[in-house]
Swiss-Prot record:
Gene3D superfamilies in the record: lpxc deacetylase, domain 1, lpxc deacetylase, domain 2
Reaction catalyzed: a UDP-3-O-[(3R)-3-hydroxyacyl]-N-acetyl-alpha-D-glucosamine + H2O = a UDP-3-O-[(3R)-3-hydroxyacyl]-alpha-D-glucosamine + acetate
Residues at which Zn(2+) binds: 79, 238, 242
Native species: Salmonella typhimurium (strain LT2 / SGSC1412 / ATCC 700720)
Cofactor(s) the record lists: Zn(2+)
Protein name, UniProt field: UDP-3-O-acyl-N-acetylglucosamine deacetylase
Keyword Lipid metabolism: yes
Length: 305
């Protein structure tokens, strides 16, 4: 059978919090079968757990948060969540001694390296996928996102940014998902923001960790980072990275075709909640062997080495 995945060992890293600008220690721990993805704040006494759940997601101007019933939150979970989706990690406990996951370089790549460093272990329990059975679409003005039935996982994302640094040929990105494709084509794409927004937020004591080290920064005319872009279409690739993380907030890889136009964290989450709320639109599935498993989810050699 296709088995659930966790880590082989505990790994730790440090980074800077996007909101506070302070050092954050991140610890990733293996977890037993059927634990799911759990974020944990150890700066609180007692520590507070936040299971990944579409209904717990809140989108703020700066990041995605998980919020519990007491309005306690953990922030900046989206890029790590994308790395978990990319590598198909089903069970993990993610600890931080702060209210937020460190921003690292603004992409998912540092988290991918950390997960690969921990090693990936298979548990003797069937991995559950969410399979889309009916088309579900959500809209917000001219923005929209939808899932259609498809035996695999494809993503097709279009942005519409009128900016000199983003030419029209760099506004759409489509891919057949796999762990290899995620690592090579998506994981290194960084988040982006306007210099004026960062300066304004910092003047109000917010976004204190925001810098050229953790984002693509633009003014009205150009990219300000000395090293420029990692991909010509890094902006839309990062929006796809965000979507992969947002859609994994249900804790399961999804079998279906995702298409979006000008979507963001909030609309991605609205789509995920709309799918899960419509019982006839999806089902849980497991697979007995590799032959049945959609190509998108076959483990690459680098992961289960």
């Amino acid at each position: 059978m296709i088995k659930q995945r966790t880590l082989k060992r505990i790994v730790q890293a440090t980074g800077v919090g996007l909101h506070t600008g302070k050092k954050v220690t991140l610890t990733l721990r293996p977890a037993p079968a059927n634990t799911g993805v759990i974020y944990r704040r150890t700066d609180l006494n007692p520590p507070v757990d936040f299971p990944a759940d579409a209904k717990s997601v809140r989108d703020t101007m700066l990041c995605t948060c998980l919020v519990n019933e007491h309005d306690v939150r953990i922030s900046t979970v989206e890029h790590l969540n994308a790395a978990l989706a990319g590598l198909g990690i089903d069970n993990i406990v993610i600890e931080v001694n702060a209210p937020e996951i460190p921003i690292m370089d603004g992409s998912a790549a540092p988290f991918v390296y950390l997960l690969l460093d921990a090693g990936i272990d298979e548990l003797n329990c069937a991995k559950k996928f969410v399979r889309i059975k009916e088309t579900v679409r959500v809209e917000d003005g001219d923005k929209w996102a939808e899932f259609r039935p498809y035996n695999g996982f494809t993503l097709d994302f279009t942005i519409d940014f009128n900016h000199p640094a983003i030419d029209s040929s760099s506004q759409r990105y489509a891919m057949n998902f796999s762990a290899d494709a995620f690592m090579r084509q998506i994981s290194r794409a960084r988040t982006f923001g306007f210099m004026r927004d960062i300066e304004y937020l910092q003047s109000r004591g917010l976004c204190l960790g925001g810098s050229f080290d953790c984002a693509i920064v633009v003014d009205d005319y150009r990219v300000l980072n000395e090293d420029g872009l990692r991909f010509e279409d890094e902006f839309v690739r990062h929006k796809m990275l965000d979507a992969i993380g947002d859609l994994f907030m249900c804790g399961h890889n999804i079998i279906g075709a995702f298409t979006a136009y000008k979507s963001g964290h909030a609309l991605n989450n609205k789509l995920l909640q709309a799918v899960l709320a419509k019982q006839e639109a999806w089902e849980f599935v497991t697979f007995q062997d590799d032959a049945e498993l959609p190509l998108a989810f076959k483990a690459p050699s680098t992961v289960l080495a």
